[in-house]
Every structure is written in structure tokens, then in C-alpha cells.
Amino acid sequence: MGSNSSKISDLPKNEYLKKLSGPESISENDPFWNQLFSFSFPAPTSSSELKLLEEATISVCKSLVENNPRTGNLAALTKVFLSRTRELRLSAECQNHIFIWQTHNALFIICCLLKVFIRELSEEELQLHFTYEEKSPGSYSSDSEDLLEELLCSLVQLITDTPLLDITYEIAVEAISAMVVFLSCQLFHKEVLRQSISHKYLMQGPCLPYTSKLVKTLLYNFIRQEKPPPPGTHVFPQQSDGGGLLYGLASGVATGLWTVFTLGGAGSKAAASPELTSPLANQSLLLLLVLVNLTDAPDIPNPYRQAVSSFKNTQDSSPFPSSIPHTFQINFNSLYTALCEQQTSDQATLLLYTLLHQNSNVRTYVLARTDMENLVLPILEILYHVEERNSHHVYMALIILLILTEDDGFNRSIHEVILRNITWYSERVLTEISLGSLLILVVIRTIQYNMTRTRDKYLHTNCLAALANMSAQFRSLHQYAAQRIISLFSLLSKKHNKVLEQATQSLRGPLSSSDVPLPDYAQDLSVIEEVIRMMLEIINSCLTNSLHHNPNLVYALLYKRDLFEQFRTHPSFQDIMQNIDLVISFFSSRLLQAGAELSVERVLEIIKQGVVALPKDRLKKFPELKFKYVEEEQPEEFFIPYVWSLVYNSAVGLYWNPQDIQLFAMDSD
């Protein structure tokens, strides 16, 4: 091709690619492969460059699909790569830059081709292209070696066994990307795939023994957040005279195949977004989430989920039960630190949810931490900026809070952690507040946001469940948190009255002659009354279990006591209103006895004195409020599209045409 190519769109005319995809068979020992693999470029990462690369690859693939049944060149390319991977570890130890660089380039080419093949071909056709036999040109045999499976196992071994050095960083990222590409057939199906070659290869056969090692490696990649090496340390720098070892390796190397990618150096500027400091960590986390969320194969549970559900702390010396497969140990302190630091991304929040929900060892460890604020504050910040987040990220953050609030120790300890100057909380200056009070404020704000915008019942339910779990352990509530609890009840009360009025008017008014259906006011009323009932139960739970710890809540209750009047005789709320009514009456009479024109400080003093005198036996006992998160049936219908949307939006150096995506709606968040 020479040095004239300057655009990715020229790739289909490239002589090396034309030969690879052409009608001539190329032997595995042909010097051609060294020429093909000897390119150096800043890998394209901007969507425009990646789109151009995809379009250019399609053209090459069309020719390859047509000719490969006769040439077997795809199999030859794969075998050359496989032979190189067997020497990769030794090459890394010997600092054999050239060998690693060429092996990376071979994998890059395979990955580009495989991505198009997976989209364009059926699984059967894909397998046929990888099962060519030289003995009988032009024919395929089911008895021949399964190169596709061998390729996948080779990628797994490359990820787990190759030491991570400056010179191996890029090939490690590329191997993980290639595995993501291998599993990407899910993107092109509306339905969740329950049987595929990926299930077959990854859940049985030679890949299976590497399960725990792969999961552990991907987790440690996430934990370590290794940054890519500085430019020039992983690829040979260009010699000033155009000579040197690199350029003497094969004819036309320096001005050959892939110089098109330099685009005058612009390619290097289109790096990952500034917040993505570790492509390896990002790609590892995405692959891990894809693997963990694969559906179980028939009669074979997902081994990657088993591994994630059972690993233990390196400091835990107790033996693993023999019945648990794919076990390993990892440093929980390092994992916890990484989880705390990385919660700005959807994928890190999803990993935290997965570990808390599925791994009891991790959950126990997290709940025992004395620096819980390091984990909870980033989660609260996600919820606080709800309008900037997608709904899935908000759900994950809320469910994490719900799981944490299932633990009484957590609910007690968060009120003992005092925070100062929460800069991201802008509604009010909070110079000093407990973590528990801040959590209440943020959850209530989320409910109010949901009431005015999305009106999502599922979101309401999770918010209220978390507050309910905490309510018996409310301690020393900040005055603003106490006010917001009552303010939320006020908002719900107004909404209830408005819906009730609309329902009454619709019954009185004439029947609508238009085709527009009337709103279901009965349904709306039922939902709002359910939420009001829940709020009353939360207030009641606090009053009956920790009244003496919360004078600010009693103060807020008395200040807005008129709000509760309409619910005293309401059949849906009569029982739960008894205690609230008793507390309001008891303290109201004490304030009346103290006279008028009382200061805030004096009112609080009267409340604190009255708490001691209030006869506790007069408060009716209710069952303790306890809600537990239970994953819905067929959770894969939610999680698999979500995970792949994260891959689509966040994977480094991977582009798919949005028009080809079937799994999720491209216009959704």
C-alpha cells in the first residue's frame, strides 16, 4: 500500500488486507504475517475514528467471507496468533518488545474482523469459518479442531497468565476487549440469549478451570486502576532516520499498513474521556459484569456468578466448603477502597450492588467497617444528582441503601458518624450533620423529585423501604431532617386532597363524549394513600422506639400538627394515627401549660422533659418495620440489557453501529 494512505477509509484498498481477504491461501509460515502485524499507530478511540474503522472492516470482511471457505486464511490468521500467545509470557519476561507488539497487532486485527463476523453471521456460519481443514480445501468438517473455542481459551489465559508490564498493558486491554466482542452477539438480539456458543465455551470445556482465576484477575484490575504506560514505552519509537530494528523487521513496515491511523497525530488526542484514567480497569469491570450476568446454561449454573458469590477475604483462614466451586480469595480492604473511590460510574455501582447482594462475605465485611461514610457518601451523591443520572444508576444506588439498611448495626452506626461541610448538598448549608440525617435528607429529596417528575412507584417503594428500615433506630435527627420528614408528609397530604377533589369532580361531571379516557383517580388515590400510610408508619416507628432520642422530630410534628387532623378519622389511617395523636396531644398540653411566646430553645426543653414523663405503655405496639430487598423473577431481563448498554456507552475502543442494536432502545437512558 505504501505511504500514500492517510485515511482509515483507504483500508479496503490496502495490499496486505486485500491479500488476507483475497482468493489466495496463505500458509501459517508465510513471511506475510510478519508484514501484516508490523504496524504502529495510536489506537483509534474517538467515535468518529472507530466508526470509520468499522466501515472499512466491513468491506474487508465481505471479501473474506466470500473467499475464506476456499482459502482458510481466517483459520491461518488465528493459528498464527495462537502460536504466538504460547510464547507471550516468556517474551514479557525477556522484554521482547517486538514479539509482544506484533502479537497485539494480530489480536487487534482478529478483534476487528470478529466484531463484524459476529454481527453479520449466524453462530453456525461463524463456527464454519473457524473450522477450515487444509487437507480438503473448500470443505469444512465437524471433526476438525474448534479454533473459536481455542481462541477464546487463549484470550482467557492471556488475561490471567501474562504479567502486567508497560509492554503488555495494551495486549491485556485488547484481550479483554476481544472477549467482550466475542460475547457481543447479545447486542443483536431483542430477547435475552439463554443458549449460545458463548455459554458452551465459557461454562464447560477447557475454559471452565480458569473461571476463578479470570474473575480474580478482572477484580484486581479494577482494584488497582493501573494507568496506561506513557506513550513510547509500549511501542518502539520512530527512528529519526527511518531506520533501526523496528523498520528493518519487514519491508514497508514504517510506511505500510497501519500508518493510516496516525492521521497526522490526531488519533492520539482522541483518548478516553478525562475521568477514565485506567482503560484496563474499565474494560475489566465491563467484562466481569457481562460474565456474571450471563444466563445459566441448561443444567449448568453460571460459574462466573458462582465465583463472584463465594470469594473470601485473604485474611479469612477458614476452609471453603467442598460443595462451593470456583473459589478464591482477594484483599477486601483494597476492594472496599476501590469501590468507595469509583462510585461515579454506573458499572462500579452495579459491581457494588452485585457483591452486596450475592456475596455474604463481602456484605458482612462492608457492614463491619468503621468508615462506612466513605462508601455511603458517594451513593448519596448519586441520588442527590438524580436529574443528571440515568434511572438504572439511581435504582442501583437506592437498592444498595436498602440492602445496607436491612442491618440494625448499620442503622445505629450511621447516626454516630458526624460529617462537616457537605459541599455538594446545596439546598442548605450543613456545617454539621450525622450521616444518618444526611441519608434521610437525600432519600426524601429523591422521593420529592420522583413525585414531581418520573412518578415511578418502584422508586418510591425502595426509598420508603429504606427509611422504614432505619426508622426504629433514628437518633438525634438534625432539625432539618426532621422538618423534611414532616414536609414530605405535607406534600403527600396536599397531593391526596388534590386527587380526592379531582375524583369527586369527575364523578359529578358529565360523561366524556370524546375518545380520551378519563384518568384513573381511584388508582391514583390508592397509590397516594399507600405512600401516606407508609410515611405515618415511619413516623410512628420512630416515636414508639426512639422518641427520647428525637426532640427535633417531636418539635416538627407539633409545629405542623394541623396536617394530621384530617387523617385521625380516616379508616385507612385510624390505627396508625393513635400513637401520633397521643404524642401531639400530650406535648401540646404541656406547651399550653408553659404559656405563650415560647422560644425554640424553651419548646425543645419542654419536649425533652416531657419525654421522660410520657407513659410508654399508652403507646400502641406495632410490628417492627422491616423490608428486605428481593430480586425480581428473571432479573436477567433487566440486568443484561443494562450491562450491555454500559458496554456500548463506556467500553474503550469498541464501536457498534446504533442501527444494529436490538437489545435495548437507543433513545432511552
Curated annotation (Swiss-Prot):
Any one GO CC term of the record: cytoplasm
Post-translation changes: Myristoylated in vitro; myristoylation is not essential for protein targeting to Golgi compartment.
Example GO BP: bone development
InterPro entries listed in its UniProt record: ARM-type_fold (IPR016024), Dymeclin (IPR019142)
Keyword terms, alphabetized: Cytoplasm, Golgi apparatus, Lipoprotein, Membrane, Myristate
Subcellular location, record wording: Cytoplasm; Golgi apparatus; Membrane
Primary location recorded for the protein, binned into one broad class: cytoplasm
Lipidation (N-myristoyl glycine): 2
Membrane topology: Lipid-anchor
Superkingdom classification of source: Eukaryota
Signal sequence range: none
Pfam families given in the database record: Dymeclin
Function statement: Necessary for correct organization of Golgi apparatus. Involved in bone development.
Subunit structure: Interacts with GOLM1 and PPIB.
Similarity section: Belongs to the dymeclin family.
Protein name per the record: Dymeclin
Organism: Mus musculus
Origin organism lineage: Eukaryota, Metazoa, Chordata, Craniata, Vertebrata
Gene: Dym
